[in-house]
């Protein structure tokens, strides 16, 4: 079974994906980490994230061992990843890796921005996570401060709105809910409530498909 979770920055899709994968004993891939790893490789090399040729090269040489690096959570890396992800050839280079991951039995949960529309259009379950931008900015600010980063919530909100605009309007694989996705608004849901709602969605699909 493949579960696709999409949504904008700081919507809670990553936490939901991780918890949902643990519940079903499936593998989990936060696809945003892939782009962050590419962005970090560029920044470490002193390259500009807007340098498309360098970004493509970094994507082709991507080392999965870099996925767990704590620095990938930094706001600067996230901003650079948002730029890198707009390049069609970068997305193409990372497509095969993501699809191979999704195909591994017994199942996988992938979260990102184009899982249900591009990476796994035939996923068994598609969930699109939404949340109010102000709520998302607050969550992202608290996460950053918990890591010891000094951040201004107003600046974080501005960054989120800018990323939303970039993600929704990029020419390749724009952020949008798949036509058959279940929309989950977790603006007012805590982690447990969000997980419970997602499990209910998955179980309803399993019942309809005769997998329950």
Curated annotation (Swiss-Prot):
It comes from the Bacteria. It is found in: Cytoplasm. Its EC number is 2.7.4.25. One of its GO terms (biological process) is pyrimidine nucleotide metabolic process. It is an enzyme of class 2 (transferase). ATP binds at residues 7-15. Keywords: ATP-binding, Cytoplasm, Kinase, Nucleotide-binding, Transferase. It catalyses: CMP + ATP = CDP + ADP; dCMP + ATP = dCDP + ADP. Its main location: cytoplasm. The keyword Transferase applies. InterPro entries: Cytidylate_kin, Cytidylate_kinase_dom, P-loop_NTPase. One of its GO terms (cellular component) is cytoplasm. GO terms for molecular function: ATP binding; CMP kinase activity; dCMP kinase activity. NCBIfam families: cmk. Belongs to the cytidylate kinase family. Type 1 subfamily. This is Cytidylate kinase. It comes from Nitrobacter winogradskyi (strain ATCC 25391 / DSM 10237 / CIP 104748 / NCIMB 11846 / Nb-255). The lineage of its organism: Bacteria, Pseudomonadati, Pseudomonadota, Alphaproteobacteria, Hyphomicrobiales. The gene is cmk.
């Amino acid at each position: 079974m493949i579960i696709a979770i999409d949504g904008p920055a700081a919507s809670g899709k990553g936490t939901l994906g991780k918890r949902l994968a643990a519940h079903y004993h499936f593998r989990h891939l936060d696809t945003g980490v892939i782009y962050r790893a590419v962005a970090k490789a560029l920044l470490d090399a002193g390259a500009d994230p807007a340098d498309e040729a360098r970004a493509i090269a970094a994507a082709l040489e991507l080392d999965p061992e870099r996925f767990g690096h704590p620095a990938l959570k930094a706001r600067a890396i996230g901003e650079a990843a948002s730029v890198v992800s707009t390049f069609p050839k970068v997305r193409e280079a990372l497509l095969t890796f993501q699809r191979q991951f999704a195909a591994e039995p017994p199942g996988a949960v992938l979260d990102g921005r184009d899982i249900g529309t591009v990476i796994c259009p035939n996923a068994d379950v598609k969930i699109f996570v939404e949340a109010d931008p102000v709520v998302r900015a607050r969550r992202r600010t608290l996460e950053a401060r918990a890591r010891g980063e000094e951040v201004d919530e107003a600046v974080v909100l501005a960054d989120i709105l800018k990323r939303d605009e970039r993600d929704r309007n990029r020419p390749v694989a724009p952020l949008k809910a798949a036509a058959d996705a279940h929309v989950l608004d977790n603006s007012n849901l805590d982690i447990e409530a969000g997980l419970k709602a997602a499990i209910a969605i998955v179980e309803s699909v399993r019942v309809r498909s005769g997998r329950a």
